[in-house]
């Protein structure tokens, strides 16, 4: 069974490219509203549901937040692929930082992993807003992913890194 986002009806949430810019429990500067620390945010959901959702090739979208959940599941898959050969937390952190420095394409640009999932930006401002939100949510996801992909002593958690070999929705990760 595919796990869906609990952010079904988010009234008053700004949208860009058909995706809600959901609040994040984040200290990283960006366009996302700040969520309360004790509440679950979309990054928590993506990490929690990743190991179950990564096995599915089809994902029935029930709310706009599911689109973001799909994107984050794919991003976690990419990040785990980068962490696959990293034997220590320090090396893994460096790999994740390098991943964060890569360009972030938005719908309509080459390299965007899910054409058709998100609507095309109606203006350059909307494209930049969405790009900045994706950058912020990716950085937040990366930080939290490192805390589960590596144990407290800095060694890899093989239970998590084993999922780097999976293809999510039959999308090949390079």
Swiss-Prot record:
Transmembrane segments: none annotated. The keyword Cytoplasm applies. Expressed at low levels in all tissues with a relatively highest expression in inflorescences. GO terms for molecular function: actin binding. It comes from the Eukaryota. One of its GO terms (cellular component) is cell projection. It is found in: Cytoplasm, Cytoskeleton; Cell projection. SUPFAM superfamilies: Arp2/3 complex 21 kDa subunit ARPC3 (SSF69060). One of its GO terms (biological process) is Arp2/3 complex-mediated actin nucleation. Keywords: Actin-binding, Cell projection, Cytoplasm, Cytoskeleton. The keyword RNA-binding does not apply. Pfam families: P21-Arc. Belongs to the ARPC3 family. Component of the Arp2/3 complex composed of ARP2, ARP3, ARPC1/p41-ARC, ARPC2/p34-ARC, ARPC3/p21-ARC, ARPC4/p20-ARC and ARPC5/p16-ARC. Interacts with SCAR2/DIS3 (WAVE complex). Functions as a component of the Arp2/3 complex which is involved in regulation of actin polymerization and together with an activating nucleation-promoting factor (NPF) mediates the formation of branched actin networks. Arp2/3 complex plays a critical role in the control of cell morphogenesis via the modulation of cell polarity development. This is Actin-related protein 2/3 complex subunit 3. It comes from Arabidopsis thaliana (Mouse-ear cress). The gene is ARPC3.
């Amino acid at each position: 069974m595919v796990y869906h986002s609990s952010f079904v009806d988010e009234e008053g949430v700004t949208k860009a490219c058909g995706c809600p810019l959901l609040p994040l429990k984040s200290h990283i500067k960006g366009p996302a509203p700040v969520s309360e620390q004790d509440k679950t945010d979309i990054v928590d959901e993506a990490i929690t549901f990743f190991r179950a959702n990564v096995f599915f090739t089809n994902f029935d979208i029930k709310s706009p937040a599911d689109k973001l959940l799909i994107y984050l599941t794919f991003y976690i898959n990419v990040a785990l692929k980068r962490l696959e050969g990293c034997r220590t937390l320090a090396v893994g952190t460096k790999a994740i930082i390098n991943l964060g420095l890569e360009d972030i394409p938005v719908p309509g640009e080459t390299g965007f992993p899910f054409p058709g999932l998100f609507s095309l930006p109606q203006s350059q401002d909307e494209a930049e807003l969405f790009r900045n939100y994706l950058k912020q949510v990716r950085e937040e996801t990366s930080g939290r992913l490192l805390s589960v992909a590596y144990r407290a002593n800095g060694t890899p958690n093989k239970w998590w890194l084993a999922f780097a070999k999976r293809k999510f929705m039959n999308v090949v990760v390079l």
